[in-house]
Structure formats: structure tokens, C-alpha cells
């Protein structure tokens, strides 16, 4: 049976989200149709507002309403360390542990030759520019995920940053290989920051 066009379009829209396959998209589409009209309107407004009002910080690449973001503007934070993460959601995970009080830099991805992602496709050039322009930064903590791509990205950044005389460390791997920072519990992240290793 073929679905009416509005349902088919809704299913297709949900399938564009990462990790959402056909069955889940269909379930979400029918759930959306069954929702109260006001809730659907509010949901749609939230999507539009998020896309319209949020952008990336011109300094660190984090998601923000203001530019620069609240973290970059906060002079009480440790200005000598920059923690490099893959995605903005990793900043949120690190902030939850309340252990790290430095600055961040969001790469928006990792090096992945298989996926055709090279250094020019992620936020590395702006990190290097930031380090050149800010002599207060003494340490770069690399917090990419413990995946082959995350490790390759960490090594690449380390090779670029070390010649500038900036200390480069890597989060300790209380994080298991293949795990994502956003899914780690607070104690694991705390231990990973505490036990970071020099590269």
C-alpha cells in the first residue's frame, strides 16, 4: 500500500535524520499525525526557530545564539587551555561534568578519507589561526572520539600544533575504543579529563 503524499513526504523528511531508518521514520510520521494540533505547531515552530536563530560561534565553532558564544565571552574561564571536540554536542557533555573550565574548539567532524573528509572539510584551519593569534593558549586537549577517525584526527592536529611549542594532550581513555563522548557518563568524562596524556 502506498501512503498518501503528505505522509510519504513526512517519512522522507524523518529519514534524513541520522540513525533514522524507514520503520522509525514511519512510526514518527504516524505519531506526528496523531499529535494534538497545537503540539505539532509548536514542534514546527521550534524546528524553524532553531534553524533561524542558532549559528556557529566565529571563534570556537560551538552552537550559539550570540556571537561570540557565552563560553568564549566568559573571561573567568581558563584562557590557557582549548579542548578540541568533534561536535557541539560534545561541548554540552563536557560542560555537564563541571570539571573543565577552559575554552573549546569544535571541529564539526573528523578526518575520514573513506567518506571523502579531509582537513579542509573540518574546522582545523580556524583552530590553527586561533592558536597563532592567541599567545595565552598554552595547552590543546584533544577530545576526539576513540574511533579510528578520531585517533587519526588527533594525531593530525598534534603534528600541526606541537611545532608551535604548545602542549598537546589527549583525554585519557576511560572512554572505551569506539565510544562517543556525548554518551559517556559524567564520572568517565571526569576521569578522562583528569588523566589526560601528553601526545
Curated annotation (Swiss-Prot):
Coiled-coil annotated residue ranges, if any: none
Gene: recR
The protein's name: Recombination protein RecR
Pfam families (alphabetical): RecR_C, RecR_HhH, RecR_ZnF, Toprim_4
Domain Toprim: 80-176
Molecular functions per Gene Ontology: DNA binding; zinc ion binding
InterPro entries recorded: DNA_Rcmb_RecR, Rcmb_RecR, Rcmb_RecR_Znf, TOPRIM_dom, TOPRIM_RecR
Zinc finger (C4-type): 57-72
One GO process term, biological-process aspect: DNA recombination
Keyword Disulfide bond: no
Family: Belongs to the RecR family.
PANTHER family tied to this protein: RECOMBINATION PROTEIN RECR
Function comment: May play a role in DNA repair. It seems to be involved in an RecBC-independent recombinational process of DNA repair. It may act with RecF and RecO.
Natural source organism: Lactiplantibacillus plantarum (strain ATCC BAA-793 / NCIMB 8826 / WCFS1)
The keyword DNA repair appears for this protein: yes
PROSITE patterns in alphabetical order: RECR (PS01300), TOPRIM (PS50880)
SMART domains: TOPRIM (SM00493)
Keywords noted in UniProt: DNA damage, DNA recombination, DNA repair, Metal-binding, Zinc, Zinc-finger
Amino acid at each position: 500500500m502506498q501512503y498518501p503524499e503528505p505522509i510519504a513526504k513526512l517519512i522522507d523528511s524523518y529519514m534524513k535524520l541520522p540513525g533514522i531508518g524507514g520503520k522509525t521514520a514511519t512510526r514518527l510520521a504516524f505519531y506526528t499525525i496523531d499529535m494534538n494540533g497545537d503540539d505539532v505547531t509548536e514542534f514546527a515552530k521550534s524546528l524553524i526557530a532553531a534553524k533561524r536563530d542558532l549559528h556557529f560561534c566565529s571563534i570556537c565553532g560551538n552552537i550559539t545564539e550570540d556571537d561570540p558564544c557565552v563560553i568564549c565571552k566568559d573571561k573567568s574561564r581558563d584562557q590557557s587551555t582549548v579542548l578540541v571536540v568533534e561536535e557541539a554536542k560534545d561541548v554540552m557533555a563536557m560542560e555537564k561534568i563541571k570539571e573543565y573550565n577552559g575554552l573549546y574548539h569544535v571541529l564539526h567532524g573528523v578526518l575520514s578519507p573513506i567518506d571523502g573528509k579531509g582537513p579542509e572539510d573540518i574546522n582545523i584551519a580556524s583552530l590553527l589561526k586561533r592558536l597563532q593569534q592567541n599567545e595565552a593558549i598554552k595547552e590543546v586537549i584533544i577530545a576526539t572520539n576513540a574511533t579510528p577517525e578520531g585517533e587519526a584526527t588527533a594525531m593530525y592536529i598534534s603534528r600541526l600544533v606541537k611545532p608551535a611549542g604548545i602542549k598537546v594532550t589527549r583525554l585519557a581513555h576511560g572512554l572505551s575504543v569506539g565510544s562517543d563522548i556525548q554518551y559517556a557518563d559524567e564520572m568517565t568524562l571526569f576521569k578522562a579529563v583528569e588523566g589526560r596524556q601528553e601526545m
